[in-house]
């Protein structure tokens, strides 16, 4: 793998750190870009302070939310629709994907993730 681009993604889970970029010594140049995404990375022990690839202020990271509330409907059942309390609402790039996985238009105010948000009942 020589490059990776992530746009409108949610990296979330049960751990404090759910996102890592790791380089292999002698692996060559690796280009990456993470934009308009929400990343769970709560480094409570400051274990990754000296790793430049995980400096979320560098230019490889653009318009991201760090440690936001995804507010998934039912992640234990793989239902990753986001609800009205999600920090991902209206934060995505509409140019990347004009529709969500259900075919709902997302050109005006797109949400980060695979689905536009809904109001849970």
Features from the language model and the residues they span:
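Predominantly extracellular beta-rich ligand-binding scaffolds that present long acidic/polar faces
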Residues: 1-79
